[in-house]
Amino acid sequence: MAASQNPIQGSLFGGNEESDLNKAEKLKGSERSNVNLSHQQLKEDASLRPRIKQTPKNPNQIIDLDELSRLAIEEPKWSHHNLPKIDDLTPALRHYVELKKENPDRVLLYRLGDFFECFFEDAITLSKLLEITLTSKEAGKKIGKIPMAGIPHHASDRYCTELIKKGLSIAICDQLEAAPTKGNKLIKRGITRLITPGTILEEGMLSAKKNNWLASVLLEAKSNQEIIDWSLAKIDVSTGEFIVQEGQGSNNLRHELIKLNAAEVISEKKSISNKIWYEGLIEITEFNRTSFSNLEAITTIKNHYCLNNIDSLGIHSNSLSIRTIGGLISYLNKTHPNIDDKSNNEIKTNICIDYPRIKNSRSGLIIDSQTRRNLEITSTQKDGKFQGSLLWAIDKTLTAMGARCIRRWIEEPTKDVNAIKNRQNIIGFLVKSSTLRKNIRKTLRAMGDLERLSGRAGAQQAGARDLVAIAEGINRLPLIKNYLNEPIFDKTKYFDSIINIDKDLIELASKINNQIIDNPPLSLTEGGLFYDGINPVLDGLRNQLDDHNIWLNSQELEERKKSNINNLKLQYHRSFGYFLAVSKSKAINVPDHWIRRQTLTNEERFVTPGLKEREGKIFQVRARISELEYELFCDLRKLTGSKSNIIRQAAKAISHLDVLTGLAELAANHNYIQPQIIDMNEQDKSRKLSIIDGRHPVVEQILVDKVFVPNDIELGSKTDLIILSGPNASGKSCYLRQVGLLQIMAQIGSWIPAKSAHMGIADQVFTRVGAVDDLASGQSTFMVEMIETAFILNNATENSLVLLDEIGRGTSTFDGLSIAWSVSEFLAKKIKSRSIFATHYHELNQISEYIENVENYKVVVEYKNHSLSFLHKVERGGANKSYGIEAARLAGVPPDVVNNARLILKNLEKNNSNTIQITKPIESCK
């Protein structure tokens, strides 16, 4: 009987692999399954395949694990670069090093049997980051042992996810054949996948409700070296979205990248020498410089989209954007190559991506990074949590597609009045049609992520369950189409792909449903994927397997009779195959021709020659079934992938419908109203911001036992600047944020929490709320505050919304007051943007006396007998007292400190009775 193969020596390294494979060639056919060998045959077998006794190596070459851990610090010793001679390595390790040289910046996972192994410096990295055992492996007689660490093949996704989260890129080297071809020493292996943070397709590695952006950026200095042009292209490989934009100024690019929060950013090698603008912000992956050249970029784009020229893209052939697009596609060609599709002998990516959409940097409401943090649009300012953000409050979507869509809307609100009103009207219709709204949401609730599912199918990485989910999603489209049988849905192009469902999709879903079982296995190579009756060859093989199973059942009964062992069972184990199991007490009664296979505590396991022969036949049939089912599945997956663009169009329509029904649900449940949006072309009214009884959309939902106090705002008609005064902790900052959030909600087309509203379109929203030291940059609180203020004053326009809170606190009283006063006048007289300036400097109330577009507002409080009550109501007029001492008392400051502060305040007021006054306006601000 053939000796079992040593899994380490036989499949991991070098010569033993070759010898075992040669032996295997000599044991084909019937000899391979002939387990009942005589003693003479066993001797002949041992002569053909001698087993070499393992002897210890030279003690000087053996490194124990403790020593290896100590030497892990000395990484250069274990780098593949420092090998004295690559030919001294075993064949498998030689191949590993060759692949590692091609992927020096990636962790190389090398498939060996049931594990992905890492060696040299990668093994040390893997061990540290994943906290797995670092072991060693013999690399050759002249080299000795080297570091080795590995992860199970079946758990590779989980471990790869951890590596990606830590910012690493991964190269997957998989086995390309089950066994070596004749004449080859090694199993054929090759790089099948490059996983980088921005090129992930695997479901478990992605956040369902966020886009995973891969970005490409290029900068180009003008001849005068003062103005920098830039282009930023971004793509989500999981959804196919492809957007490109251009701009000027490194600061603007910085804000765009902060807003984008890309998983990965690439650029041409050595093109960005000045790191000041992005250092500490992003990590840039350098890529082949020639891929970003204008000529090669054009060739890449034409090859990918099968175009004769690029004019149809609407991008100038000499623009920076052509280069960023071409570089991005080239990067995908490398990370996701489609080996089966070569055009002009060039490998194309198998990722299905849309045509690049040109984004006008002025087409949407601009919200800088500081404002995003201050308004807590997608995460809270304090701890970065989702709960408590605006998105948390208004996202009522039910699908992952819808969740990503509303995030995009809220991160980039539009200035398109027609688009806003269209969304508002659909929301209004759905608010009134509660039954329709509930039916649509019920249908959407179980909808899979068609965008990403179709992306995996297009890249030929989808599993059987992915295809079933795609079919289930498509099957819901006709029902949704019936729900959209209303005139209002015909007025928008959002839903064209649902209203006019492509017949090919229905046929595809039917084919998947008729062929793949309802709950298919995760593995694609072990069979059990398809129903009976879909392929005659598959049916014939399954018939053979049924015959073998019948024989197994009869064999169990027959062996019971022969052995008189009534509790005998014929069982199967993945490692041992088929065997006869009997209790320990009955083992002495087994027939002589039974061969003992395994002894357990309470059981003995045996095999018979006939059972082993039948097992070989069963394994052959199973292998043919698995191979055929995999071929059938790949054909079906390829067909599904060819429809990925059509599926994605339907998915985009579903995402819009999900967002709009969610916003309608929000409006209906929280008593929202439709704001009247004023077109920017209406000169007299375009800057109006009038909200009656507005409410903070987030705070209102957080309050459980209290009722939120609504407040009005009136800006843009006669008043451009509101000076808002009032005690500390009275709600001034909340009021500022409320106004900003309602403007953003209105410009995504949402209804808002208010009694009524008339709102003009804002081109930008700016906030300056609070500040902290930036220790990393060596900037004090006051300097941070001034930098933020300067940015606002240099970029705001008359159509902007500016929200300022307590400017001038970080310096002396007179300096702070002077700066606050001057900033207020600059906003009111020169920029004339719609602005609210919250302050504790009551002297600023005087500005309204000589500048007609300034008005004073205050937050009302009740103060009796040293007791302060916050009413949170904003009214016209200026406050004349800060009540800071009373706020300190409410905060829990010790009574002795509070009382002493009152005495000190009286003395200060007595000695400084004169108030600061400005008798005439500052002419320089005209």
From Swiss-Prot:
Q: Does the keyword DNA damage apply?
A: yes
* Name of the protein in its database record: DNA mismatch repair protein MutS
Residues the entry annotates as binding ATP: 726-733
Under the heading HAMAP family, the entry gives: MutS
Indicate the secretion signal residues: none
**Gene Ontology biological-process entries:** mismatch repair
User: Which organism does this record belong to?
Assistant: Prochlorococcus marinus (strain NATL2A)
Taxon lineage:
Bacteria, Bacillati, Cyanobacteriota, Cyanophyceae, Synechococcales
The region called Disordered is annotated at 1-60
InterPro entries in the record: DNA_mismatch_repair_MutS, DNA_mismatch_repair_MutS-lik_N, DNA_mismatch_repair_MutS/MSH, DNA_mismatch_repair_MutS_C, DNA_mismatch_repair_MutS_clamp, DNA_mismatch_repair_MutS_core, DNA_mismatch_repair_MutS_N, DNA_mismatch_repair_MutS_sf
Summarizing the function annotation, the protein's role is: This protein is involved in the repair of mismatches in DNA. It is possible that it carries out the mismatch recognition step. This protein has a weak ATPase activity.
Q: Where is the composition biased (Basic and acidic residues)?
A: 20-31
